[in-house]
C-alpha cells in the first residue's frame, strides 16, 4: 500500500501495520513503512506508533502483489 504524509506530501510504502514497538517501556501497536530519507535520499524503514501514523498519513494506492 502506498501512503502519503498529510503535511509534506511525501509518499511511502506501508510494509506492516500489525506489529508492536516498545516505547517508554510499554508495548504499543505500530507500523513499519519505507521511504526516502530526506537527508541522504537513501531508502530507509521507519517505525511509528499506529495511532500517530493513522493521524498523519492517508492511503493513496493499494498495490496488490501479482496484480
How should these model regions be labeled?
Residues 10-19:
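Short beta-strand-centered aromatic/proline hotspots
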Residues 10, 29, 53:
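Residues that flank catalytic or metal-binding motifs in active/ligand-binding sites
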Residues 1-6:
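Short coil-to-beta transition motif at edge beta-strands of beta-rich domains
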Residues 42-67:
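Intrinsically disordered, low-complexity, charged/polar segments
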Residues 18-50:
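Basic/aromatic-rich interaction segments and small domains that mediate binding to polyanionic partners
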Residues 7-9, 41:
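Glycine-centered tight beta-turn/hairpin loop motif at sheet-sheet or coil-to-beta transitions
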